[in-house]
């Protein structure tokens, strides 16, 4: 669990997302409240429930990006799901309880990786012994083993090919998986058939030829797993989900039944009804045991283009008490997105062209022109936010990307003239830009 302060969380999010101060602050406070709750006495801790968040804003303004960055910051079990992927209980498809099962699976992986780090030193030693045995043989004298150990540590044996008995990781029962729902148990929480048969066929080993360098990763992973207590991993992961789990529910507006809607849309309310107990707090049965969702934090987001937040079921609105509105992006925001973020498209295209030995530099007027065109097309066609920059940049670099291998050593300056030459005609022809940009 992260112990960053709200100010630190916001400044970390600022590196990748421009603007949206309110949304960042709400998310930062929610994350910090997880840490605060852990400092309380046991009886009070049980009474403090998370305040779930509803983020409302047009497409392409940073809702999903906030969730993606939050997942890396949280250091807690985290899952991002689209509400549209789920169906009402009783219909074919995934029911909403699968969200918690997937969250537990993520937590198991995270906990296992964390615990592996703790036993890595011992696992490394055991892996070293197995490599030496594969090279020198099991009946080699201690002096011989010591000689190989020195060579191994010096990296002299990295390219030597050895034959090892390693665990067979292939799943012999994968053919029995349900199409479209890999590894999922149609019956809900218990152990699924694939896993059951997988365990029956488990414990098999195969002989593999690997170089010493390649074998280390495989062997360390195997030896670490031998040192881990599966029961402790599962227990720790379930506790982490119950106390610190975070679920990001994207596209929540797509399961709203609009007040004027008729027919199939109305059945979407079933998904909302199924979400109610999950968000309020219920017990979900998983193959690792029952999981209580009382203290899982839910962050829902939606564009609410057609539906309105008031079209959500009143009970669901009540379970998402913190409302945050994200504002549409302006031309000035686009300039900042292209220059200030750590993963700016300008940096990406410069690096991509650099692989072909083409040096690309962006002039200030070039960046301003890109931002202006993106903002204009958003206004005149459809406002898709920062995603418009992808389309504009791709069109500007289309010719250069194609010819780059033949232009090795060239230096290109992306200024207003370059942007105009590659995009000008399209932006002036509104009908054409409607389809191309």
From Swiss-Prot:
SMART domains: AAA, ClpB_D2-small. One of its GO terms (cellular component) is HslUV protease complex. One of its GO terms (molecular function) is ATP hydrolysis activity. Coiled coil: none annotated. It is found in: Cytoplasm. One of its GO terms (biological process) is protein unfolding. The keyword Secreted does not apply. SUPFAM superfamilies: P-loop containing nucleoside triphosphate hydrolases. ATP binds at residues 18, 60-65, 250, 315, 387. Keywords: ATP-binding, Chaperone, Cytoplasm, Nucleotide-binding, Stress response. The keyword ATP-binding applies. Pfam families: AAA, AAA_2. Its main location: cytoplasm. ATPase subunit of a proteasome-like degradation complex; this subunit has chaperone activity. The binding of ATP and its subsequent hydrolysis by HslU are essential for unfolding of protein substrates subsequently hydrolyzed by HslV. HslU recognizes the N-terminal part of its protein substrates and unfolds these before they are guided to HslV for hydrolysis. A double ring-shaped homohexamer of HslV is capped on each side by a ring-shaped HslU homohexamer. The assembly of the HslU/HslV complex is dependent on binding of ATP. Belongs to the ClpX chaperone family. HslU subfamily. This is ATP-dependent protease ATPase subunit HslU. It comes from Dinoroseobacter shibae (strain DSM 16493 / NCIMB 14021 / DFL 12).
């Amino acid at each position: 669990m992260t112990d960053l302060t709200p100010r630190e969380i916001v400044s970390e999010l600022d590196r990748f997302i421009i603007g949206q101060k309110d949304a960042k602050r709400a998310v930062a406070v929610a994350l910090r409240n997880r840490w605060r709750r852990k400092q309380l006495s046991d009886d009070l801790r049980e009474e403090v429930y998370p305040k779930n968040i509803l983020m409302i804003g047009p497409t392409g303004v940073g809702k999903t990006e906030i969730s993606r960055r939050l997942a890396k910051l949280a250091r807690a079990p985290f899952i991002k799901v689209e509400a549209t992927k789920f169906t009402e209980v009783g219909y074919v498809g995934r029911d909403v309880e699968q969200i918690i099962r997937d969250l537990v699976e993520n937590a198991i992986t995270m906990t296992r990786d964390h615990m592996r780090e703790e036993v890595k030193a011992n696992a490394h030693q055991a892996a070293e012994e197995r490599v030496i045995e594969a090279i020198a043989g099991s009946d080699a004298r201690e002096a011989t083993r010591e000689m190989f150990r020195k060579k191994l540590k010096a990296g002299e044996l990295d390219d030597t090919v050895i034959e090892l008995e390693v665990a067979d990781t292939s799943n012999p029962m994968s053919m029995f998986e349900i199409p479209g729902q890999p590894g999922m148990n149609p019956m809900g929480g218990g152990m699924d058939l694939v896993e059951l048969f997988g365990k029956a066929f488990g414990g098999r080993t195969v002989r593999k030829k690997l170089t010493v360098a390649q074998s280390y990763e495989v062997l360390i992973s195997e030896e670490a797993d031998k040192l881990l207590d599966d029961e402790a991993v599962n227990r720790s992961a379930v506790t982490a989900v119950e106390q610190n789990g975070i679920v990001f529910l994207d596209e929540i507006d797509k399961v709203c039944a609009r007040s004027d809607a008729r027919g199939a849309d109305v059945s979407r309310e079933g998904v909302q009804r199924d979400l109610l107990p999950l968000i309020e707090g219920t017990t979900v049965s998983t193959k690792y045991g029952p999981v209580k969702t009382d203290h899982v934090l839910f962050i829902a987001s939606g564009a609410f283009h057609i539906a309105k937040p008031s079209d959500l079921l009143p009970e669901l609105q009540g379970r998402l008490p913190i409302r945050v509105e994200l504002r549409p992006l302006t031309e000035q925001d686009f300039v900042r997105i292209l220059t200030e973020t750590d993963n700016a498209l300008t940096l990406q295209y410069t690096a991509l062209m650099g692989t072909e030995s083409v040096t690309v530099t962006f002039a200030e007027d070039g960046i301003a022109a890109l931002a202006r065109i993106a903002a204009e097309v958003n206004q005149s066609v459809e406002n898709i936010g920062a995603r418009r920059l992808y389309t504009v940049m791709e069109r500007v670099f289309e010719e250069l990307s194609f010819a780059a291998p033949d232009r090795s050593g060239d230096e290109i300056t992306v200024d207003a003239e370059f942007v105009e030459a590659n995009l000008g005609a399209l932006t002036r022809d509104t009908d054409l830009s409607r389809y191309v940009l």
